[in-house]
């Protein structure tokens, strides 16, 4: 493993960006000067940014650098797709401590590049700096859309149908599995260290030797995730739903409002209703949930509907369409109609399987909440 200090900031940037190939006509100049040069003569530019902090947004105990790079890019693409546009460029800034190596950053950039290649996105610039502890990542994504194609959160109208892509709650259940296995691993390490300290206090050399032989087993620890791969991928390596934007356009369906589901269905739906000055009514039985999500929620003794409503990080699309598009969308694979838009005075309601009604609560993840 190579210390980053051996290259320095500019050497690191040169190494990480040397193989970047420009793909978009709108990218006039990328990495290598004081600024990137972009040109959008006939479309609107869409700009979004996300900051990811180690220990808050990601955990390197169970996330490798390639996967981190991939996810960091994809969550930004998701915001652009949620505006009914397509991502074109990203700018990447990283603050990292001395504990990270050049090889770590190589892997991170390879993951980002894999995500960019999937949607023909150019990496056009960024910055690197040192951090006293941990890793911080900030990515700005620039996309484009024709003015008439852009979809805001504020366009939902009474009687519009509420739709979601894919299934919900899987990413949250993937996180529960990872956190459980992490807890088991650290519990075993704590128990091991306790035994080592006891043996040292007793000067028990035979016991210490036996414990030393066990150490490799901890270092090689690999949890059994058999049958849970789908849930883990939804958490660690989400896919931004640009494919659904392409399919909606092919069917000539123009959403009236749209968001990506990063903080949870309930939270995002309430954002749309607030900005569109409307209410909503969704049906518990219509919320799409994968079988593995349901099985795992039962294992953890968690309420399945709550996981789907508030789990977050699904990066599916939540959107509304005019009721006149019902015939077009009802048989669209991978899309579920879960309810409809109502008058604002009727509130945001969930109708349960037994026909009871409850006010939706925005319990999505809050990064500023004190723990």
Predicted ranges, named:
Residues 65-89, 110-118, 247, 267-271:
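Small-aliphatic-rich amphipathic alpha-helix that forms the alpha element of a beta-alpha
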Residues 147-236:
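Phosphate/diphosphate-binding glycine-rich loops and adjacent basic-rich segments that engage nucleotide
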Residues 240-249:
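A short, well-structured juxtamembrane/interface segment
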Residues 39-42, 52, 88-181, 340:
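Glycine-rich anion-binding loops of enzyme active sites
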Residues 37, 76, 84, 123, ...:
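Residue-level signal for inorganic ion chemistry
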Residues 1-64, 83, 92, 370-371:
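Extreme N-terminal cap/leader segments of soluble proteins
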Residues 29, 61-75, 99-110, 148:
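Glycine-rich anion/phosphate-binding loops
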Residues 2-21, 63, 96-122, 130-137, ...:
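Glycine-/charge-enriched secondary-structure boundary and capping motifs
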